[in-house]
């Protein structure tokens, strides 16, 4: 809801992300001496080799980790990002999907492939291989690695990844790395707000025009 509220002009990221940014910096002392030397694959490999006790990452990383150490016993828990137990939520999101174009000349064949891929038994194979959580309702067996998240999954207490709303032009990944190196909360938040208004201006204009037109609905 944060991105929507910012687009509506009701708040800004300087206000909404300040506490988060400060807590983000607090994680640095618990990492390696030079955390910026690690790429994604490097971090997965280091964790697989026992160079760290915990790894703040999503369940999607487990196939990469297990490719290095198949016998590693991995467990998980939901990051306690709030001081209030009731406010805790599981970050999750759909980043894989299928589609058939409107101009497809072989739609029946394409739909047959999709029906095959989305059959329960094939979804279960994908779950087993990728340690994934299905988007399709059904009696699927999740990996024991997800036991620490199961309560949230079964309750539907999940919140979409914020980066699904970030314009790619903002290069938020680079902004975050710069922030962690410089550790200047004010500069990071100021740039984030400025870039959001710049690269998201068309959506902001449409959202505010819509809300103005439908304010009494």
Regions found by a protein language model. Give the residues of each.
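Periplasmic solute-binding protein
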Residues: 1-5, 87, 92-101, 167-177
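Glycine-centered hinge/linker elements that transmit conformational signals in sensory
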Residues: 3-37, 79
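Extracytoplasmic/periplasmic substrate-recognition and gating elements
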Residues: 29, 66-129
